[in-house]
């Protein structure tokens, strides 16, 4: 493992990404703890912490400029309190493929008032009953959850389920937090699917090149790694009418 130092931050790749944001690339260093980010001097719109060994999402200084945080493929099992004090403008948070287990572990995200794009895919918590409605109720500012746009009907269902004394008790009952973390506990054990063909790989690469948000780029990279092809993902069902719906539930545009 590598300690995140001011020297590492200075040496890491820094560039203007596909959506014209200034990005700091800290992926793949096996960093265990987020620290020393004051050395960035708040000069970045996006920071990529993918493919590290981070267990807790905290340790941020005040970063007013930061809008996008990519933390997929880590070991995150806890989310620190008071993230809004450090990251007041965070709009995109990608936590795909981590170790979040309990619904209550997601509660600190409610403080991030600017958060509109959130991915918690491939975390054990997504298998919990009422997972999606719970997140929609607790973090109502999120417009896109797990690359699926939040529908008006879902907001109404979440409000109905968790409102009042009975709803508050239900939320309390299902929202216990993790007390301990056992490495590997609760993680999926499914066998990997076969890889895509050369033509499929090219199709995904083209889709990545045309992506309009970092979140969409990360989703497409995940498809490439898992052998899925854009346009062949399983649909969640027929679309219902509503002011927050789009024709295709899978979000491909950050607008």
From Swiss-Prot:
Per UniProt, residues of the LRRCT domain are 123-161
Q: Where on the chain is Phosphoserine found, per UniProt?
A: 178, 197, 236, 255
What GO annotations for molecular function exist for this entry?
Answer: U2 snRNA binding
Give residues for the crosslink Glycyl lysine isopeptide (Lys-Gly) (interchain with G-Cter in SUMO2).
172, 221
Q: What is any one GO biological process for this UniProt entry?
A: mRNA splicing, via spliceosome
Q: Which organism does this sequence originate in?
A: Mus musculus
UniProt LRR repeat ranges: 20-41, 43-64, 65-86, 89-110
Q: How does it assemble?
A: Identified in the spliceosome B complex. Identified in the spliceosome C complex. Found in a pre-mRNA splicing complex with SFRS4, SFRS5, SNRNP70, SNRPA1, SRRM1 and SRRM2. Found in a pre-mRNA exonic splicing enhancer (ESE) complex with SNRNP70, SNRPA1, SRRM1 and TRA2B. Contributes to the binding of stem loop IV of U2 snRNA with SNRPB2.
Q: What keywords sit in the KW lines? A: Acetylation, Isopeptide bond, Leucine-rich repeat, mRNA processing, mRNA splicing, Nucleus, Phosphoprotein, Repeat, Ribonucleoprotein, RNA-binding, Spliceosome, Ubl conjugation
Q: Give the protein's function.
A: Involved in pre-mRNA splicing as component of the spliceosome. Associated with sn-RNP U2, where it contributes to the binding of stem loop IV of U2 snRNA.
Q: What gene name does this entry carry?
A: Snrpa1
- Protein's UniProt keywords contain Acetylation: yes
Q: Where in the cell is it found?
A: Nucleus
**Family per UniProt?**
Belongs to the U2 small nuclear ribonucleoprotein A family.
Q: Which residues carry this modification: N6-acetyllysine?
A: 172
- Put simply, this protein is called U2 small nuclear ribonucleoprotein A'
Could you tell me which residues belong to the region Disordered? 179-199, 222-255
An example of a Gene Ontology cellular component annotation for this protein is:
nucleus
Q: Write out the biased-composition intervals (Acidic residues).
A: 240-255
């Amino acid at each position: 493992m590598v300690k995140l130092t001011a020297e590492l931050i200075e040496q890491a790749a820094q560039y203007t990404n596909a959506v014209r944001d200034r990005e700091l690339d800290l992926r793949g260093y096996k960093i265990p703890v987020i620290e020393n980010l004051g050395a960035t001097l708040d000069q970045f719109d996006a920071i990529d912490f993918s493919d590290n060994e981070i267990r807790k999402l905290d340790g941020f200084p005040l970063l007013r400029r930061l809008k996008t945080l990519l933390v997929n493929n880590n070991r995150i099992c806890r989310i620190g309190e008071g993230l809004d004090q450090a990251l007041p403008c965070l709009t995109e948070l990608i936590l795909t493929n981590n170790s979040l287990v309990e619904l209550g572990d997601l509660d600190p995200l409610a403080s991030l008032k600017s958060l509109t794009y959130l991915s918690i895919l491939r975390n054990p918590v997504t298998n919990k009953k009422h997972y999606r409605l719970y997140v929609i109720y607790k973090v109502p500012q999120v417009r896109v959850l797990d690359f699926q746009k939040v529908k008006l009907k879902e907001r109404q269902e979440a409000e109905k389920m968790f409102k009042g004394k009975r709803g508050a008790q239900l939320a309390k009952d299902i929202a216990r937090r993790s007390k301990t973390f056992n490495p590997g506990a609760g993680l999926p054990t499914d066998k990997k699917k076969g890889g895509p063909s050369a033509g499929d790989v090219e199709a995904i690469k083209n889709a990545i090149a045309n992506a309009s948000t970092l979140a969409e780029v990360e989703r497409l990279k995940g498809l490439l790694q898992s052998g899925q092809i854009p346009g062949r993902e399983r649909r969640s069902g027929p679309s219902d009418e509503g002011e927050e719906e789009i024709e295709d539930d899978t979000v491909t545009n950050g607008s």
